Amino acid sequence: MKHSFSRLFGLGDKEEEAEIAEHDTNKEEIQEIPVGDIIPNRFQPRTIFSEEKIKELAATIHTHGIIQPIVVRKTEREGQYELIAGERRWRAVQTLDWEKVPAIIKDFSDTETASVALIENLQREELSSIEEAHAYARLLELHDLTQEALAQRLGKGQSTIANKLRLLKLPEEVQEAILKKEISERHARALIPLKQPDLQVKLLHEVIEKSLNVKQTEDRVVKMLEQDKRKPKPKRKAYSRDARIAMNTIRQSLSMVEDSGVKLNTEEEEFEEYIQFTIRIPK
């Protein structure tokens, strides 16, 4: 199914399709551009490219040529172009030592360029779960959307978007492990109930060292949570009803903000006479 950008993300009246892989090249002027004059898309959500798949693509291109031109835009530097879509094809022709590559030149803004790169990769379904989560978060930010609205535009369930975004709350070390395929997405999601980053990282190391499967990881999480419950809790001064309502309202509001894709750094401290919430929002 094809969706115009204007309908999907309100990017104006351009006839560009969100599904870049199916450009109608009959309406576009294809030009031969020097391979060395092209730079990667700075908004590319994919951080890892399989060398083996690039070689396979290069072999196909060597035999059949490039059926689908890459898409680029001009940069401020004279004679230089930035990729919008087709980075795997661009990488493949570099291994073939091609001097020029067929391309379509678009006059896209940063927002349009980022959106095309994100949507193209999401539709190909080759991103890692972390790359996919970052892509969703970026689209939410670029277009000021709710998770529900983004899910509707991408034809996905809201729970799918929410589950991916929750992965971004995990420590960087856990996210790196997903990218490197040291653990699966299900392993990572099993760590989320632990809440504390140090415990999540500790269990991550155990999962990798002992090659725990998802069920074993979930069982370890349950045991760690039970151990935490058994620890003696310091006596606290009782809260008034108004204080409890205020605290719950703040926590719910923070949760809603984080579920929208904004990564907050929050601290909750209890003092003798008051509760202090510290919220840091990255710029």
UniProtKB/Swiss-Prot annotation:
Protein name: Nucleoid occlusion protein
Feature: DNA-binding region: 148-167
Functional summary from the UniProt entry: Effects nucleoid occlusion by binding relatively nonspecifically to DNA and preventing the assembly of the division machinery in the vicinity of the nucleoid, especially under conditions that disturb the cell cycle. It helps to coordinate cell division and chromosome segregation by preventing the formation of the Z ring through the nucleoid, which would cause chromosome breakage.
Alphabetical list of CDD domains matching this protein: SPO0J_N
Places the protein is found: Cytoplasm, Nucleoid
SUPFAM superfamilies: KorB DNA-binding domain-like (SSF109709), ParB/Sulfiredoxin (SSF110849)
Protein's organism: Bacillus licheniformis (strain ATCC 14580 / DSM 13 / JCM 2505 / CCUG 7422 / NBRC 12200 / NCIMB 9375 / NCTC 10341 / NRRL NRS-1264 / Gibson 46)
A Pfam family it matches: ParBc
GO CC aspect terms: chromosome; cytoplasm; nucleoid
Main subcellular localisation: cytoplasm
InterPro entries registered for this protein in UniProt: Chromosome_partition/occlusion, HTH_ParB/Spo0J, Nucleoid_occlusion_protein, ParB/RepB/Spo0J, ParB/Sulfiredoxin_dom, ParB/Sulfiredoxin_sf
Single Gene Ontology BP annotation: positive regulation of sporulation resulting in formation of a cellular spore
Domain of life: Bacteria
The keyword ATP-binding is assigned to this record: no
GO MF annotations, alphabetized: DNA binding
Keywords linked to the UniProt accession: Cell cycle, Cell division, Cytoplasm, DNA-binding, Septation
UniProt family annotation: Belongs to the ParB family.
